[in-house]
Amino acid sequence: MVEAAKEKIKSGDVFQVVLGEILEVGTNLGSLEFYERLKKNNPSPYMFHFPTPYGCVAGSSPELIMEIKKDEIFVAPIAGTRSRGANAEADAALERELLSDEKELAEHRMLIDLARNDIGKFAAPASVRVQNAMRVVRYESVMHIVSEVYGSKPRGVSAVEGLGTIFPAGTLSGSPKIRAMQIINELERYERGIYGGGIGFWRFNGDVMQAILIRSAIFVNRGGQNFCSDENSKRNSNLNLNSACGEEKSEA
């Protein structure tokens, strides 16, 4: 699957394709207990636990699809990952390595451009701007390169229209987005289902927050399927989540 995607990139068919995978594991934990331990050992800004017709979903997402607050649009693309170091010195060395990795930086710049383009399709003219570009944000198990992209939502454009323009997130699809999604549909062995969807809230005043449904597990008959992130990175942050989830199971 990965090699086929690389050939698509080499041929110029697409610049980037973000492939996904499903890891099926057995566990004695219930979904709520899993969520509680995940929150303790691998906290993220957007954590969730909720029932669906397919099973209970629990997860720890670091990333937004989109937030609109008082008509300000906000997207924070994440691309570029390293594991956390054993101490502050190791963390600093890994951060320097991450910020000097041309592959990671090129991927991140591409996603900034994609976010600017997506927001620009429905934002007020000349309102799209990038702030705090290429900063490293540290989480419990990993560190990521993160940038912030803003725009102003004009009157007459609803949050639903805005989300429809941005969805799915570029970090879960690729660039150009439509062609990347076609390739994903061709190459991935399973339909994504809820993976890569949105989880969040809508307010009556028009504010909205939708996080990306990644780094999550769906519990079916008390078992778990781990919906992981991009397969193209050698230092895949999924492995860090899988490791964190393994720590949950070892405590059971």
Q: Residue locations for each model-derived region?
A:
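Extended alpha-helical targeting/anchoring segments
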Residues: 1-252
